[in-house]
A protein has these predicted regions:
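Structural/interface elements that position substrates and couple domains in central-metabolism enzymes
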Residues: 38, 199, 203-209
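Helix N-cap / loop-to-helix initiation motif
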Residues: 43, 68, 169, 219-223
Length: 344
């Protein structure tokens, strides 16, 4: 099976299972980059909503100059929908599962996909951090099962995590990495099947400390978010935390770590503040209240501003990565990481 390259774009059949926010974004990105895609959901109304969301997203991309109207029309022609799982996967080469984050549900679905999809088809999951090995074990083709985790909004955020389960075929990993690159993404290979993979482990480490600081009265939610977007988050868009430490000086970071590490705690369960918010039904944007209050109008406005920001950031990142270095020997933007083993 070949998922990449010019010719397979007219032959390879992609299926996205699940028409929620992530499924719609993934299907849109595939179709708008020349892939034939079937989006499947048992809820016909969800498919209608997904089509509407994709149309809105394409219009926004066109307005931002990231996509032409012709590309949108061609992408729309390559995207079909169905409520029949059997019909969707009958001739599939790659099935991307994007259903709710429940391991038992996903295992049942993967077992059904294993029964219905052609023997050569790869089955991959958009899970945010559930076990790829367990998903593979629910099929008779564990070597053809991998993680393929996109970030929301899928059509804008560059990161895609390609995750190896214990039995995942390395060739499938290479094909998924190449596919994601051809789709304009910034893929990474998660070599071990650990809960949360890489992105969410980093995100939740920060989230845990953010909750602690707010719960202890150190800072307000608003100032906490400003600290991140105006400080580490601002530079992390270009330099990751390890290279940022290189720039800051590892001696400086070691000095700070020597007194700060012991104060960061070792909690093994969600903080009480988060428990109390969940019990109160305070779930964030979906309930109209989280650390901030949201009305439908304010949420719509905020979402539009977020997407415009991400579009502008994507344009800047794409330009910066494609721009030639100022000198032939300037390797700052693409410095090769030094892989060091921990001291014995």
């Amino acid at each position: 099976m070949n998922l990449t390259g010019q010719e397979p774009r007219t032959q390879t059949r992609f299926v996205v299972l699940g028409a929620g926010t992530m499924g719609a974004g993934i299907a849109q990105c595939l179709a708008d980059h020349g892939r034939w895609v079937t989006m499947c959901d048992t809820d016909a109304e969800a498919l209608v909503r997904a089509r509407e969301r994709i149309a809105t997203s394409r219009q926004t991309l066109e307005t931002a100059g990231l996509q032409t109207a012709e590309q949108s029309r061609e992408g729309d022609q390559r995207l079909s929908t169905t409520t029949s799982l059997a019909d969707a996967v009958a001739a599939a080469d790659l099935v991307i599962e994007a259903i709710p984050e429940n391991l038992e549900l996903k295992c049942r679905v993967f077992a059904e996909l294993d029964r219905l999809a052609p023997a050569h088809a790869a089955l991959v999951s958009n899970t945010s951090g559930l076990s790829i090995t367990r998903l593979g074990q629910s099929t008779n083709r564990p070597g053809q099962v991998a993680g393929f985790h996109w970030w929301n909004p899928a059509e804008l955020v560059p990161l895609v995590e390609v995750v190896s389960g214990e039995s995942t075929d390395p060739q499938l990993v290479e094909q998924l990495l190449e596919l994601a690159t051809e789709l304009g993404k910034q893929p990474i290979h998660v070599r071990r099947d650990v809960p949360g993979f890489v992105g969410n482990r980093l995100q939740f480490a920060v989230f845990r400390e953010a909750l602690h600081l707010v719960a202890e009265g150190v800072v307000t939610p608003e100032d906490l978010d400003r600290a991140m977007t105006g400080g580490p988050g601002f530079r992390w868009s270009f330099l990751g935390p390890l290279q940022a430490a290189d720039f800051g000086g590892l001696d400086v970071f070691h000095s700070i770590a020597s007194y700060l590490w012991q104060d960061l705690g070792d909690a093994d369960s969600p903080p009480p503040l988060l428990d109390s918010m969940l019990q109160a039904g305070t779930l964030g944007t979906k309930s109209g209240k989280g650390f901030y209050d949201y009305t439908p109008e304010s949420l719509n406005n905020l979402t539009e501003r977020r997407d415009r920001f991400l579009q502008g950031l994507k344009q800047l990142v794409d330009f910066t990565r494609s721009a030639p270095a100022s000198t032939a020997d300037d390797d700052t933007a693409t410095a090769k990481p030094q892989h060091r083993q921990p001291a014995a």
